[in-house]
């Protein structure tokens, strides 16, 4: 009887040991997977998909009228796809579109939005906040104290600017089709100030000797790569390559500066 109990106890101990090994192995595997995901390392299945689909051409809609990011076939967005092709062999059909028009629904799109919280399928590449500029050197501490001034904004930004600053009856907004028109209006003294995105317009600000008089950190543009919402290997490959590319690009920027 004692021998039987002893055997049963040994069996229970062995079962617990086996379960412990299985659980520990699962935790280790999960940690390795999470680490690989965080570093943009492709899984075996993803590598296999890439090898089998190198002849596949993936449609990507890409902004083509935004300085620095996508302009006449050059910029950050185009560099990303070129590096993606070079490193994986995947080919992309780059479908250009302009910011004033709707992009083709290709499933993969470089676009701009001003969301406070991005969706899971939107991969952030850069954030550019807005500034108020002027021909005169000054610092505005309180926007609400501006009196009897005309501010230039693009038509697409008017609602956003008004929502942020609220009602100020002494401020008049003149709207324009694009930033170039705003710059000309400011140079010709048709407006006192202008509100525009900062980084992509630095060349315009510096070349015209404009001054940044108010930094608007709560109004910004997100430059994102939007992928379709499906769970598949290609989407996973996109996300991991994005992680790898962003880390490399950041390190290259730090080294260069």
Language-model features, listed with the residues they occupy:
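N-terminal Sec-pathway targeting helices
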Residues: 3-19
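Extracytoplasmic small-molecule ligand-binding "clamshell" domains
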Residues: 10-11, 38-118, 150-154, 164-188
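Hydrophobic alpha-helical membrane-insertion segments, chiefly the h-region
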Residues: 20-31
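Extended ligand-binding regions for polar small-molecule ligands
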Residues: 32-44, 75-87, 136-140, 144-158, ...
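Generic beta-structure capping elements
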Residues: 61-65, 135, 228
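Acidic, polar ligand-binding/catalytic clefts
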Residues: 78, 82, 86-87, 91-145, ...
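Extracytoplasmic/periplasmic ligand-binding sensor domains
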Residues: 161-170, 179, 185-193, 197-211, ...
